[in-house]
Regions:
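Glycine-rich, acidic/polar active-site loops that bind/position phosphate-bearing ligands
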Residues: 1-439
Length: 439
């Protein structure tokens, strides 16, 4: 059934014993929020939207003009399977607008949607996939997270070294119940680290899937008495967690990343744009102070370069065929706002296409070894969140593509993060409370 009208939704609610409906959205950093509406009030909420206090949401509104409205995207409706079957809970993803119906500059879903439309106007179809890594930790006797991983397994290990296989199984089955398409599931390099990948989809669908995936993982982990962490570098001596973004472009049904990529082709110019703007984008793809502990080791890039297959590069072209042909951006981490991260990567690629940027030759060296990078003159990604904010603030490109309101508030909030950690009496404890326990 296609849920395209309000009556479709109301019929679904009645047929499935739904009692609560979550209107879900995210703040400027990608932290999911929601308002639950009782099913008896759903008709009015669908008609009028749901008003809320935008001044209480990071990066949204000032208190003197705080009202905002949630407008549900009816196509995103889903039942939350881990909630009770009696009095079931349903959820929409929502766009955010002003009370008079005017566009709200902080509506990150809207930003990604508008960017995708620009590709469609050029006759291009974007497919996006996300590879999301996360850690599973034990809780203490009081149910509080510890930094003790659930196992000592490594890459592709199996039980008993891999203690997360049943958790991943439950996650994948829940994803399928909710209309998502998990593709791969395995233990990652770090102790207690896991990865589950979804099939590629349109940009907005993939960003919604990332938000839903994190919600599912946390719910299944909590049900199992565990803590799921999407912190980029939760353990200093273990691999960091990434959110690799895979992108392919289609024109007239043909995958432009299939076969050799000419430096001045559409695919080549798209890659050139992503590489050219990668430093400016880093504050959006890697938004935490902790994010910068991940770069340069454990398969996380530091240099702005590309290659085929080589996992030490910022961008790589996997050795695959057909519809699987794509470029992979390896710098983003799972703490990012997926709507902004994917939207800005698309914007950078589009800038490359529109300005006919030419892709530079590949770098076929292992850049995890600093000696290999010496003498190549490669640009580096920012080494800290402060440096990333500065690069973004100085970016003419970002001033062109981002709504001024959104950019100003994002940079302000990021600088607050830097100052808070810098001024903390115990930075490690501050990170534990504000990031490890929450991200």
């Amino acid at each position: 059934m296609s849920y395209s009208t309000q009556q479709d939704i109301l019929d679904f609610v009645e047929d499935n014993n739904v009692k609560f409906v979550r209107f879900a959205f995210c703040d400027i950093f990608g932290t999911q929020k929601n308002i639950a509406v009782l099913a008896s009030d759903l008709s009015k909420a669908l008609e009028d939207g749901v008003c809320f206090d935008g001044s209480s949401i990071a990066g949204f509104m000032h208190v003197e003009e705080s009202d905002l409205v949630l407008r549900p995207d009816l196509s995103t409706v889903t039942i939350l399977p881990w909630r009770p079957t009696e009095g079931r809970v349903m959820q929409f993803f929502c766009d955010v607008e002003k009370p008079d119906g005017a566009a709200f500059g902080g509506n990150c879903r809207g930003f990604l949607r508008s960017m995708n439309r620009k590709f469609k106007k050029l006759g291009l179809t974007c497919n996006v996939g996300a590879e999301c890594e996360f850690y599973l930790f034990e809780n203490d006797d009081r149910g509080r997270p510890t930094r003790i991983p659930i196992d000592f397994g490594g890459y592709f290990d199996v039980a008993p070294l891999d203690a997360g296989e049943n958790i991943r199984r439950d996650i994948c089955l829940t994803m399928e119940q909710m209309g998502m398409s998990p593709q791969h599931s395995h233990h990652e390099s770090g102790n207690g680290q896991n990865e589950i990948d979804c099939h590629h989809a349109g940009p907005l669908k993939t960003a919604d899937n990332v938000m839903m995936f994190k919600q599912i993982v946390r719910a299944i982990a909590m049900r199992s008495g565990l803590h799921a962490s999407f912190l980029p570098k939760p353990l200093p001596d273990q691999a960091g967690s990434g959110l690799h973004i895979n992108l392919s472009l289609y024109m007239d049904g043909r995958n432009l990343f299939e076969g050799d990529i000419a430096p001045d082709s559409i695919a080549g110019s798209f890659m050139a744009g992503v590489l050219a703007h990668s430093r400016e984008l880093t504050v959006f793809t890697n938004p935490l102070p902790n994010s910068y502990q991940r770069f340069g080791c454990d398969e996380a890039p530091r240099y702005v370069s590309w290659s085929r297959q080589n996992r030490s590069q910022l961008v790589r072209i996997p050795q695959v065929k057909g519809d699987n042909c794509r470029m992979e951006l390896r710098s983003p981490d799972p703490a990012c706002n997926p709507y902004l991260a994917i939207g800005l990567v698309l914007a950078a690629g589009l800038d490359g296409i529109e300005h006919r940027m030419v892709l530079q030759p590949p770098v076929n060296k292992n850049l995890f070894h600093p000696a290999e990078a010496e003498g190549l003159g490669l640009e580096t990604l920012p080494a800290s969140l402060e440096e990333a904010v500065q690069a973004a603030q100085e970016s003419e490109f970002l001033h062109r593509v981002l709504p001024d309101e959104l950019a100003a508030r994002y940079f302000t909030e990021e600088l607050k993060r830097c100052e808070a950690l810098k001024n903390a009496a115990d930075p490690a404890e501050y990170e534990r409370v504000h990031y490890f326990n929450a991200i």
